[in-house]
């Protein structure tokens, strides 16, 4: 494996954006595979398990960690998989301390067409049909200074569009 960790992203655009940030944060880490999971449907959970097994076969000696919504909603089942070396809480996945990394801010990942800035995450509603609150937790917003810092970083990297 190279010095760039493999981050496998399943699910929504927010997961894709978070995966890019994790990849930038973990630059230089070797022999690491992260599965950023989804749990929005039963099929998404099945695909998460499949991605975990596939990642282990492709990287038998790498440390394989799982984060994301399925790592929250299916915590016991995912942790019991023999392929999995550990779980990182969804709420902590962008915190370098959760990965035993230095707390310096990572550079914004380079984007080809658009950069993503998540300003709100989670949900305070308890709709019977939705698993988002269990996977992402209660609603919380990024402080405006952090939003501006992230936008500035993307602009410095040459992002032509910010979503």
Q: Which role does the model predict for each range below?
A:
Residues 1-163:
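Proteins enriched for Cys/Gly/acidic motifs involved in redox and nucleic-acid/cofactor modification
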